[in-house]
Amino acid sequence: MIVEIRINNCYIFNQEVVFSMNADMRNKRFITNVHKENNFNILKAAGIYGSNNTGKTRFVKCIADIKNALLNRKSRLMSNLFTDNSICELGITFLEFNREFSFDFKFDENKEEYIYECFSEIIKDQYGNERTQCWFKKDVINKEYYCADENLDTMLPVISNNSLFFYQIDTTKFKYLDEMKKILISFANKIDIVNMNNIPIKHTIELMKNKNNLQNKIVE
């Protein structure tokens, strides 16, 4: 379940944009639209409205790019045309296996390399206090490397940056890295993006005719 999306220097976005699904529990009007899990309160559904060319479609494209990166698919990320910066920044916070996690990465469009990765677990107690536990961090630019698995830090600087780190090595030998990989892949496989423009007009007409009670089947 998506909790937050973070975008910077991607497509139309030339500065950081944060889309949050965290529910404001002070507002009781839409309490039925709140999913509660392990002290986290997340909106079940949200809508994005705005005029043309404000980034709505590109926002969804960024979610697709995050999914593609997590599933080791070729990246088509593009940096903003009006900034002298080829580095795209994306991040996502999500619920998976009744826990909240955060993953951020930076992709250099020119070099086609992932120059930054950071995975953390967000732990929240019954009083609303949060703490972040970092599992993995790889910062190529600043040469900062960390992994909760012992003896893995020394490997990080010498591994290729062509894909996310957990696709570069056999993770089964490392407890935290292997669990991180399973969490991210499991979550990414649950992201579904429906493009309404790709629905054939013929299918729409058949549905309107309600042949063989198609409308009832869709409602079911």
Short names for language-model regions:
Residues 12, 26, 97-99, 112, ...:
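Generic "edge-of-domain/loop-turn" microfeature
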Residues 14-16, 98-102, 130-131:
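Short, mixed charged/polar active-site loops
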Residues 7, 92-98, 120-124:
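Short acidic, glycine-rich loop/turn motifs
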Residues 109-220:
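Electropositive, glycine-dotted interaction segments
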Residues 41, 47, 51, 60-111:
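Conserved P-loop NTP-binding catalytic core
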Residues 1-64:
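Pre-Walker A-like glycine/lysine-rich segment at the N-terminus of P-loop NTPase domains
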Residues 4-8, 79, 150-154:
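Intrinsically disordered, low-complexity boundary segments flanking structured domains
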